[in-house]
Amino acid sequence: FDEAKFRDTNPNILRNNAKIEDISARMNEALISNNLEALRDLIIECEIVCPVSGSRNWTEVRQFNLMFSTRIGSVSDEAEVIYLRPETAQGIFVNFLNVQKSARLKIPFGIAQTGKAFRNEIVARQFIFRMREFEQMEMQFFVRPGEELKWFEHWKQARFRWHLAMGLGEEKYRFHDHEKLAHYANAAADIEFLFPFGFKELEGIHSRTDFDLSQHQKFSGKKMQYFDPETNESYTPYVIETSIGLDRTFLAVYSSAYCEEKLPDGEERVVLKLPAILAPVQLAVLPLVKKDGLPEMARDIMKELKFEFNCQYDEKDSIGKRYRRQDAIGTPFCITIDHQSLEDNCITIRYRDSMEQERVPVKELGEIVRDKVSMRKALETI
């Protein structure tokens, strides 16, 4: 069976392909000419139904502005219309030469920033996954023209390794390579994460070519070119972009970490199984009782550790209740100082996930915790 020949000669397939091409051409023409009535006629003619309700009762076709507009100026009559930024990237492009010259940077180099972005989403949903005001972490990496696809692959893999190093589980990540590209891109891929509502985009990696710098140069009338001392020529750099949502990352981490467990003794506990490198409190220092010199020893240990680790001191309630409190906020290590600690200078370290306990000398404590909370160590294991 020759499938290609069948597709090229079968009259039904040829007829349907011709119909698809005609519909696509009409839709494209209507979009370009902003003919909303023609778009509605096309919807009715093709008998398009809502995939959820099955209804054909469509509203009129309307324009949606996905950028927020406002006015700037103290006098309303003279106020100028401005738009809130839908991404942080353009601030980097505008300041590209300022940063390059002041920092004396040579290509390839990157500029990264974290900031707010605003999008007038038609439907904001799925908790903090899709919001109208959100935090972005973006990097624009400037490269020589012709080398962009090499660097695109480099950052695609580097960013994936970074996500894996956070310790949420390799099975929760996957790539989605774009077949249809934005007008500014010649390559694009998403890193998707398995949220409670399915795989969704967490980070985008794009090869933006020289589109942004060229557009700024065109409309500002100022050159946005880099002089390369190695090739002795000036050119507009190409750009590789990595763009990740901080709110989505927060959601990914916490939706993966939250757990309600039933223990062998029948009790239940709420535990936040945050990777140690991400835990806001890495170490809890807990004297067994509030007397007999145990708080004093615990505070001395706290003084030694607090400059290197995020620590919390707690002496209120029973040791069991304190363990549960630390489990609930995701503290990976609890250090207990008991009466024997005064004699042998050893403490008990309790591991959050397994609840196992280990007796270790105080002098080895820093090294044990340091290895567990090091991002460098995590990346080395990937």
Task: Describe the predicted segments one by one.
Residues 1-382:
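NTP/phosphate- and nucleic-acid-binding module
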